[in-house]
Amino acid sequence: MVAIAIFMIVVAAIYSTWTLILRASQTTQHTAAEAQRQRIALRTLEDSLTCIQSFQASMKYYGFVVQNGDSSVLSFTARLPGIFPRNRKFVNPDLGRDFNLRRLTFTVETGPDAEKDLVLRQNPVLMDMDADEQQTPLVLAHDVNKFTVECWDPQKMDWVNGWETTNLIPAIVRINLVLGGNPGAGYAAPERAVTRVIAIPSITLPSVLQIGR
């Protein structure tokens, strides 16, 4: 009996150790995956913002929209490179598609597991968004605790949470992206907060230059 008791204690200790190792491995894998997603999300935001285009005479199509809060929104129009995500859907010579000028809409939405996701939808600048983009946007990051976009206001000499100058685009934006763990999955990774300051190389083309004199 004593031998059996000792054996059970050893088995329990081995199982406890194995469980701890498994949980640590899950947390490490989850953290690494989310860190990679965070890098991809920030790279996508940076690439698109540096390709932004804006025309003062057509602000209906080229407006710059920022909305911070629980359901943050960032929307603008950009001429995108060939390596941009989902580009082959919009640029395909065989199908007669050449829509590299597209409106991008980044939003924070509730995902299928009740977590907050950062998603991206795209549509050609003169066309409505199709059903596929509406229903299955590109998910850039899961477990988003915070996504804010601040714009540098040269008049206030400070960062502002919104952008009310609708006929211009900001020269500099600051993006804050905070991703957290997923306790619902049985483990919790630490929060990962990243702030990125991005200078926008474009300016809004004045109406007089667009329509001529």
Residue ranges, per PLM feature:
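Well-ordered beta-strand positions in beta-sheet-rich domains
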Residues: 98-105, 137-138, 192-197
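Short linear sequence signals and composition-biased patches located at protein termini or domain-edge surfaces
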Residues: 141-213
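Conserved acidic
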Residues: 6, 37, 136
